[in-house]
């Protein structure tokens, strides 16, 4: 089985501070084979102890199956529209809207339009 690795970006993921231009990164994600050949693409912008930032783009109709994150989560929609299902609640989210979730909370989603969102994963250091 052949494994495809994403090309290394010119952008650092760690350091005393990291700067990202989200609009530029979204455009970059949409030029990669994962976007052209599938319904989504993502890149980890920052990963350090206790904090991970992941920028994700979804094509209209892309489904995020129900899953649970072991960390606290903040999902910030940058562009597009998506439905987020948490338990028996369904939220329609658009640009500028943010949802936070506690660790272990089951959730699922679907893109209603081509959508970009920033996912922030935060580990509780007191656990």
Region roles according to the model:
Residues 1-50:
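A short, N-terminal "cap"/entry segment at the start of jelly-roll beta-barrel domains
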Residues 37-39, 52-69:
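Conserved short histidine dyad/triad with adjacent acidic residue
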Residues 55, 78-79, 94-95, 113:
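A cytosolic small-molecule/anion-sensing beta-strand core signal
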Residues 60, 71-87:
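Glycine- and acidic-residue-biased ligand/ion/polar-headgroup-sensing regions
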Residues 64-66, 84-85, 101, 106-112:
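Short beta-strand His + acidic residue motifs that chelate non-heme Fe in jelly-roll/DSBH
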Residues 81-83, 90, 106, 116:
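Structural motif
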């Amino acid at each position: 089985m052949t494994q495809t690795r994403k090309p290394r970006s010119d952008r650092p993921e760690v350091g005393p501070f990291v700067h990202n231009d989200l609009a530029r990164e979204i455009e970059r994600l949409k030029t990669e084979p994962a976007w052209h050949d599938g319904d989504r693409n993502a890149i980890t912008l920052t990963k350090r102890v206790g904090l991970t930032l992941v920028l994700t783009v979804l094509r209209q109709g892309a489904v995020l199956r129900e899953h649970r994150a072991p960390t606290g989560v903040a999902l910030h929609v940058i562009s597009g529209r998506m439905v987020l299902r948490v338990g028996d609640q369904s939220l329609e989210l658009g640009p500028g809207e943010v949802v936070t979730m506690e660790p272990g909370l089951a959730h699922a989603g679907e893109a209603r339009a081509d959508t970009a969102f920033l996912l922030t994963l935060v580990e509780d250091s007191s656990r």
